[in-house]
UniProtKB/Swiss-Prot annotation:
Entry keywords, A to Z: Disulfide bond, Membrane, Mitochondrion, Mitochondrion inner membrane
Protein name listed in UniProt: Cytochrome c oxidase subunit 6B2
Pathway: Energy metabolism; oxidative phosphorylation
PANTHER family, per the entry: CYTOCHROME C OXIDASE SUBUNIT 6B
Membrane topology: Peripheral membrane protein
GO-annotated biological processes: oxidative phosphorylation
Function: Component of the cytochrome c oxidase, the last enzyme in the mitochondrial electron transport chain which drives oxidative phosphorylation. The respiratory chain contains 3 multisubunit complexes succinate dehydrogenase (complex II, CII), ubiquinol-cytochrome c oxidoreductase (cytochrome b-c1 complex, complex III, CIII) and cytochrome c oxidase (complex IV, CIV), that cooperate to transfer electrons derived from NADH and succinate to molecular oxygen, creating an electrochemical gradient over the inner membrane that drives transmembrane transport and the ATP synthase.
InterPro entries linked to this entry: COX6B-like, CX6/COA6-like_sf, Cyt_c_oxidase_su6B
TM regions (residue ranges): none
Gene: Cox6b2
Segments carrying motif Cx10C motif: 56-67
Amino acid sequence: MLGVQAQMPAPGQWTTPPFDPRFPNQNQTRNCYQNFLDYHRCVKTMDRRGKNTQACDYYFRVFHSLCPVSWVQRWNEQIKQGTFPGKI
């Protein structure tokens, strides 16, 4: 986990996400969606264990860099309404 922390820029400085070997193709739609899921799963797990969610910030930064704002807003609304199709 130390390697991930070393890659994170200071708050407010957004950079291009590093290469993820799970998504080698140019189309990054799946990468966006997977990092959105990973972030919410991480937050849920850390909250359940009573730990700090700062470790989840990496996923937050990646999906905010890759995903269109309209998608994120729609997914967050679906989560609040209980209609989000992904497993969190």
